[in-house]
Amino acid sequence: MKQILRAFLFLLLFTATVNTAIADEKANVTKQGTVRGRIIDATKQTLPGASIYIEKLHTGVTSDVNGFYTFSNLDPGTYTVKVSYVGYSPVELKITIPAGRTLEKDVVLNEGVELQEVVVGGAFQGQRRAINSQKNNMGITNVVSADQVGKFPDSNIGDALKRISGINVQYDQGEARFGQVRGTSADLSSVTINGNRVPSAEGDTRNVQLDLIPADMIQTIEVNKVVTADMDGDAIGGSINLVTKNSPYKRTIAATAGTGYNWVSEKAQLNLGFTYGDRFFNDKLGLIVSASYQNSPSGSYDTEFVWEQDDNGKTYVNDYQIRQYYVTRERQSYSAALDWDINANHKLTFKGIFNNRNDWENRYRTTLKDLDPDGNATVRIQTKAGTPDNRNARLERQRTMDFALGGEHLFGALSMDWHASYAKASEERPNERYIDFQLKKQKFDMDLSDERQPFASSKTGSTMTLNDEFSLKELTEQQEDIKEQDLKFSTNFKLPFKNGNKLKFGAKVVRKTKDKEVDFYEYSPLDEDAFMTNSLANTVDQTNKNFMPNNKYQAGIYASKEYTGSLDLNNASLFEKEQVQEELAGNFNARETVTSGYLRFDQKLTKDVELMTGLRIENTNLAYTGRTYDADEDLTSKTDRQRNSYINFLPSLLVKWNVNDDFKVRGSFTQTLSRPKYSALVPSVNLSLIHI
């Protein structure tokens, strides 16, 4: 109730402010005109974030990410317009606004020259664009351009993000996978492509895998640390917007090729990229297409230890692991963008991007399990692999795609844009296999003098090397299929007033579906002695004198990936097959519909002080189906569909003080939300009766 009351009072204040501005408007606006155009440099590269200022009206705008600007609701007449951009000489020009019509006026800026010194700045053009966008934005933002990303050997967009202040990342095999804004969890920030939220291929969370998208497919990275009313509200940490390449002002052809070498895999890497863009039909139709391919064989050495404390307060290692990974990651990405200028007042756009990542992984792991203070433990030796059609490795295939159709329209003083999009993310893990051997009651001497590198050495009669004393602990195969799909439609309206004030309002509908299906089987050989004989005859030695944590650790001998992958597990004359029902309990089917609307008012309080007030309302409807697991019967079944709905009122207030051209002071108050993880919403039930 308090939340509704706060939102109501905020809306009253908002309405009063807007009404005051509207009262200042002339009743007749049909005779007023509009000027729109694009800011470019001498090479016909667009300049986003340029400042365009009409001196007579004491009002200004900034060019958008494609360099476009618009002034509407202008009285007919002649105006002096000033255009400025960091690193370029400012331009002052006169324009004449026709009554009831739209004037198209592109502006060309030239790079500035100081003291007759010739400065070669081609490598920093995108960086200047990013600085201008940060400088002129109302909120607190960081913008990274393509040329800034290109300075570093970043294979994916996550690695590029880690170079932005306030962003830290979570790694997987040395590559940045999840981004965290201002120290919050990865699922508390939103990741969007061209303003559309990216669905997640993760099973139980809303985290978006940033390592799916190659860095060279993105034109600009925008990190909004303050979420405004016209942005999705589920972004407590902030919003990361990835802007794909836009159609150029002139023909563009670019190709890149690169390579590298990984010392763990001892293999070469390959990076390829291509971009083509041009304009056709008297510059009415713009097109750009891009493709990227990366193949990166790599690996890692790993030691992991779990420390415990006994009853006397003495610390000891309870779990001791040595791991050797071999990983090959292949990325393919394709994007296209089209824009069609129907006339000065109407424009249609299309953008699409498809990303595919194949991740082949083999892991060899030696574990001292349940290690006690006296050095007693069970030795476990495990190989992770896959079937021959997947290179005998665990294949994780993740895909994301986003296709958006949109339009921009100008009706007198009122401008409108709309977007309809389809997005999908998926993860497949076919035939993921684990073979695990164990040997109980082994004794080890533990050297705990170095807490970072504790070391276990076998006592006489004990071993941690696979031999005929070991027995099969576990042989499993898993199939995983996760899909998330989004259908979105949004529309936004913008109405300019006098003195640079603007009213923006709009609505959005998002229909989300997510399904997780995991199938898990355990296999028991009918002749275990023959199976162990075959296993010991098909081993691989992973001993490596260059083991990076310290060469005193050695991974040892394991069942080979080729042997593990070749096992005919579905042959009933060789193996007994059992479906593990408990593993199916995490499956679910989710349906979400989020309907939202917002009001946002931008007001110039003085020449140097700007105020933005806004209110966003989001209505969320949920329908989830989980699984019930009966431990006594060892059966899994679907639950009834559970429904729920809730409404959130999200006010925002931003202030910007332009002390001078190079000094800006910003302040903000915003309210955002975090949607629960899928695992927290799924109606799962575990049943087990205790008999006394």
Give the residues covered by each predicted segment:
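Structural signature of Gram-negative outer-membrane beta-barrels, strongest in the C-terminal barrel
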Residues: 341-343, 400-404, 421-423, 482-488, ...
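Extracytoplasmic beta-strand/coil segments of soluble accessory domains associated
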Residues: 158-197
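Short, acidic, small-residue-rich periplasmic hinge/interaction motif at the N-terminus
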Residues: 24-32, 36-45, 50-55, 84-88, ...
